[in-house]
Amino acid sequence: VDLSKYSEKLQRIINRLNNARRGTTVKDAFGDDLPDSINLYDKSNVLKKNIDPSTYKFLSPVMDITFDSVTPTADDPVRVTFVANNMTDNIQVDILYYCPEHGWEVLQGEKISDNQVAAYFHAGSSVMALIYREKGATVGTSQVSPQTGARSTWPIAVSAIFFVSFGIFALYKSKKA
């Protein structure tokens, strides 16, 4: 990242994000500099407002993205494809982007192949990073996920063993008397 292109505050945030330990969430990496609101954008609209950045982790460092021969706008967004060799089927890869117009936002990624993801940029050159979340994680709320799989049966088994043991003990005591 060519830090000389950005304000001191943005330089400090970029350094903080790039110096975050592996596995740190986007929310924790921002720390005190976390924006009040981060929105998720698709090709042309806000998909979700005020998403939860604690569901995301970094897949790449923060880097410059420069548009030379084209100027992205909200009416004419530019599709950019990225290579992400560590992408798996269990994760959703999106882009953390510092929009010159809106500030920090997340651009929805579209999986192109096993190691490529694309996103639409609606503003000019700035900084961005590939981020990911587990596919089961919700980005907009703290809703409880529906239960998947079988319920745990150990409480029933423990209860059954207790009652069978109690029955055997009662039967033994009644025969002795």
Show the residue positions of the predicted features.
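Beta-strand-rich interaction surfaces with strong enrichment in secreted/lumenal proteins
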Residues: 63-71
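C-terminal membrane-anchoring or membrane-association module
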Residues: 160-177
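Feature for mature exported/ectodomain regions
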Residues: 1-58, 70-92, 132-154, 174
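Surface-exposed loop/edge segments in extracytoplasmic proteins
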Residues: 101-109
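Beta-strand signatures of extracellular beta-sandwich domains
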Residues: 94-96
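C-terminal beta-strand-rich structural cap/linker in extracellular carbohydrate-active enzymes
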Residues: 118-140
